[in-house]
Design a protein with these regions (language model features):
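A conserved catalytic-core segment of Leloir-type glycosyltransferases
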Residues: 44-105, 208
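An aromatic- and histidine-rich active-site surface loop
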Residues: 18, 88-98, 112-133, 139-148
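Acceptor-binding helix/loop patch of EC 2.4 sugar-transfer enzymes
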Residues: 12, 77-87, 133-170, 213-215, ...
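N-terminal subdomain of nucleotide-sugar transferases
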Residues: 1-65, 181-183, 213
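Nucleotide donor/acceptor-binding cores
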Residues: 3-5, 111, 234
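Helix C-cap/helix->beta junction micro-motif
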Residues: 38, 129-135, 178
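Donor nucleotide-sugar binding/catalytic pocket of nucleotide-sugar-dependent glycosyltransferases
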Residues: 136, 146, 161-234
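Structural motif
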Residues: 111-112, 181
Length: 234
């Protein structure tokens, strides 16, 4: 019988299984479903603030026992109104600060972890905590932050921008160096992370495209779909 593992997932900007309404499964839900289906226990760390809806899921910290094998932990943060702006930076700073407080109280360590990047701050906090305890983790690169912010500036201002964002560069490189492996949705993202952190590629670094679950359709549904496309001239 395979060993039953405890896996942590840290993904703060994606829909959660506990969210109301329909939502497209992304990294967090897909991985959690795969792990729990295999009989493992999963703790999914996320934010109390819903990035897509721009509303809070709860006030303060909350733990949700979503199923027998899946616990969802919501980390408090102030939230923000716009995807780009100081409000989001402040939210991520507070999110990381609160995550650090919660980790200090943690008594049960995971066997392994999967960490979404960005946010840089919380990813750096989590990888550092895991590294100190020799717990393997995979850092999932979803964005080329903070490099793309500097690259978007006129050439004459890029050195100034890099200096202003230097704390983010430090935390990002630390997270990428302290993780056991890197993953990304595309080869270009993985190459950027390896180059950014001066990290030699190993067998632990891999590209994992975002996919959706296979869905079963009936013969009637298939026939109806074919007829619809034929009407469109396809």
């Amino acid at each position: 019988m395979n060993q039953k593992l405890l896996i942590w997932i840290l993904q703060t900007g994606e829909p959660l299984p506990s969210d109301d309404g329909l939502h497209r499964p992304m990294r967090a839900i897909n991985l959690a479903n795969a792990l729990t289906s295999a009989g493992h226990n999963v703790v999914l760390w996320s934010a109390s603030f819903n990035h897509q809806m721009k509303v809070h899921r709860c006030n303060g910290y909350k733990s949700i026992q979503y199923s027998e094998n899946l616990e969802i932990r919501l980390i408090p943060s102030p939230g923000y109104k716009k995807n780009i702006g100081l409000g989001r930076l402040f939210d991520h700073m507070i999110l990381a600060k609160n995550l650090k407080k919660l980790l200090k109280q943690e008594k049960v360590e995971p066997n392994a972890a999967f960490i979404g990047y960005p946010p840089i701050e919380s990813a750096s906090i989590m990888t550092h905590w895991l590294k100190k305890r020799n717990i393997p983790c995979l850092l999932d690169i979803k964005d080329q932050w903070p490099s793309f912010m500097v690259d978007a500036l006129p050439r004459g201002f890029q050195s100034i921008g890099r200096a202003i964002l230097s704390p983010y560069f430090y935390l990002a490189k630390r997270a990428m160096k302290e993780t056991t492996g890197l993953s990304a949705m595309a080869d270009d993202f993985l190459k950027w992370a390896l180059d950014f952190s001066n990290r030699e590629r190993t067998n632990n670094d891999l590209t994992v495209p975002l996919t959706t679950e296979n869905c079963q359709i009936s013969d009637d549904e298939r026939k109806s779909a074919i007829q619809w496309w034929e009407k469109q001239g396809v």
